[in-house]
Amino acid sequence: MKFALIYGLFCSKPRGPYRVDNIASHGLTGSESFYFNMVKALSDLGHQVDAFGFWTKEHVDGLVHYYPFTGGGDDMHVPEPASYDVAIAWSEPDYLRVFPPSVLRLCEQQLNDFPYAGEGFEKHVDLFLFPSDIHRKHVLSVTPRIDPGKTGVWGNCLSNEDYFTGKEQDRGKRIIYCSSPDRGLHWLCEFFPKVRARVPEAELHVYYRYMPWYRQMGQAWDPHNPPAHAQGMRARYTGAFFYKMGTDGESGVFLHDSVPNQQMVAALESSRVLAYPCDPVVFTEGFGVSVLDACAAGAIPIISDVDAFGEVYGGTAIVLEGRPASSRDAWVDTMVRALTDDTLQQEITSRCKAFSRKFTRKARAKQLLKIISSLRKEAA
């Protein structure tokens, strides 16, 4: 089949342009990794893939042709739109307007609503796909114009395939946090000193783009904008924590920047625990690729049961009930046990690694092909 995969400017411009001839040089988010992994997975299965996005240049790699947006804007030139079998837009359904109804048009929605989409966007989509059923239901609740019968679930994939090398590294007593800082880092800042008091060798390694977020949200004081005000409180609290504890290991705390995926693999594989006391201001986590990556890396994921986490990772990760505010002691006790109980580590690690193999890029691509086949049978 011939695929058009579109990663639009609304999602890609804040993070691009991307070097598609060396994508490994980027520190990709879970959604970005999913896109580029599907480009590779579908081409590896023998399909022709034209990838449209905010690239540094036009580039051909085997069965993949990368087409950059023209003129530095959102102009997308599609050679012969009717020649495609399937067009998939990542979170931006407006790009599907150019394709005729003869092309199967899918929108893979990673965001939590559609306020940026143009009027009538839903009329140009044959199927909306969501990473979890809870995410699907949330988006439908805030976007009633979408027909529930035109929706489905297609889970994300691992951000990297380098986890399954069989190599095992010394994990020490390292705890890692590698998600957006607004989603729960403030709780970890409260919990870690208590953990370190009981496990003196404990280290906390924080990844992702903390400083840009802190500089922006640390100035948010307006109580009439509750979501921004809440983030401002979190930013100032975490800033005070790093000021007190240091960022280079003085008190066991290390603040890292966003890093390329291969470095993130190494960081997760050398960590004993992924601690994610997720507590978003609004619905945020429709899947949580960082948790999936931790599963594959053999780090013990300790997460809160919010948004889609219980649905996706229940029975695999250690999922603590409710929001962290109602389970402070449980969070500290669980992290201490995960750092010190080798039997628990072996049990959880084995379970998580087996779970993660269901989410390789090849497995996700094959599921997509089944979805496409089913849609075609229904249309016949």
Label for each model-derived stretch:
Residues N37, F52-V139:
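Extended catalytic core of nucleotide-activated donor transferases of GT-like folds
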Residues G218-V265:
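Nucleotide-activated donor-binding/catalytic signature segment of Leloir-type glycosyltransferases, i.e.
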Residues D126-S141, R145-Y163:
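Donor nucleotide-sugar binding/catalytic pocket of nucleotide-sugar-dependent glycosyltransferases
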Residues A296-I303:
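Short hydrophobic beta-strand element within catalytic cores of glycosyltransferases
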Residues I6, K167-G184, L188-F192, R196, ...:
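Conserved donor-binding/catalytic core segment of Leloir-type glycosyltransferases
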Residues G30-S33, D342-S373:
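A charged, aromatic-enriched C-terminal amphipathic alpha-helix characteristic of glycosyltransferases
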